[in-house]
């Protein structure tokens, strides 16, 4: 988890946030908090359409408070084509219409705080949806473009680039690379996706990518979010040169 206390342009954690043992009077709240995870799509449906939503969560927060919960952790509620349960994010600054609106999110956060609950949300920084505006721009811009440099695009191996750049597998099975068709119809570069083909990996060596996620964090901090669970934090930075994988 990444705890935050203010949406100011400063580090989102400090050494003081992490050095105190859980039983210290100076320990941050999250060290011994009871955190309840909510998958928005299936947890509580307020409008009767068969899909869980943010108003449904808001209505049931008193129940969680009465259970002794200290914080709720929401799985992704962002705009998404839902190829991977919302972990394929198309817009990090908006709510998927299936779940509600930003106003619904604000109301949920306010109600949680009124009840003494903290709100944590999932952040998915390793990859975006293939429907994200950045990836669509990368496909349109072509090889060598600044737009492609936000992701992990590479030329293929083999005489005609017909083989993937390395042997990395996808967590979901098969190879971790997909070849694109360029604007002129020719077979083109390959992009890395350590998960689904619709989840292209971002290039975390790129300063624009790092800045974008700082801005996303601050966007949600400004709306009152208390912290973040960072998805695939261990996979953000890949080995230099992307060498073949030798196994565990």
Language model features: what each stretch is:
Residues 226:
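Receiver (REC) domain switch/active-site residues of two-component response regulators
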């Amino acid at each position: 988890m990444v705890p935050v206390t203010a949406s100011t342009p400063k580090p989102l954690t400090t050494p003081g946030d992490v050095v105190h043992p859980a039983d210290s009077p100076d320990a941050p709240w999250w060290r011994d908090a009871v955190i309840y995870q909510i998958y928005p799509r299936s947890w509580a449906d307020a409008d009767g359409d068969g899909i869980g939503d943010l108003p449904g969560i808001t209505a049931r927060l008193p129940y969680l408070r009465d259970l002794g919960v200290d914080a709720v952790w929401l799985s992704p509620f962002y705009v998404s084509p839902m190829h991977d349960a919302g972990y394929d994010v198309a817009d990090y600054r908006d709510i998927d219409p299936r779940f509600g609106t930003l106003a619904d999110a604000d109301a949920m956060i306010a109600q949680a705080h009124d009840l003494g609950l903290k709100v944590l949300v999932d952040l998915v920084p390793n990859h975006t949806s293939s429907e994200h505006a950045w990836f669509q721009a990368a496909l349109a811009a072509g090889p060598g473009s600044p737009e492609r440099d936000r992701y992990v695009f590479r030329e293929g191996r083999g005489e005609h680039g017909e083989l993937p750049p390395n042997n990395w597998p996808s967590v979901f099975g098969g190879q971790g690379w997909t070849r694109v068709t360029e604007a002129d119809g020719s077979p083109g570069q390959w992009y890395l996706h350590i998960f689904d083909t619709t989840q292209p990996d971002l290039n975390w060596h790129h300063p624009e990518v790092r800045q974008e996620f700082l801005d996303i964090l601050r966007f949600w901090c400004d709306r009152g979010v208390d912290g973040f669970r960072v998805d695939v934090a261990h996979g953000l930075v890949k080995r230099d040169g992307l060498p073949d994988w030798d196994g565990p």
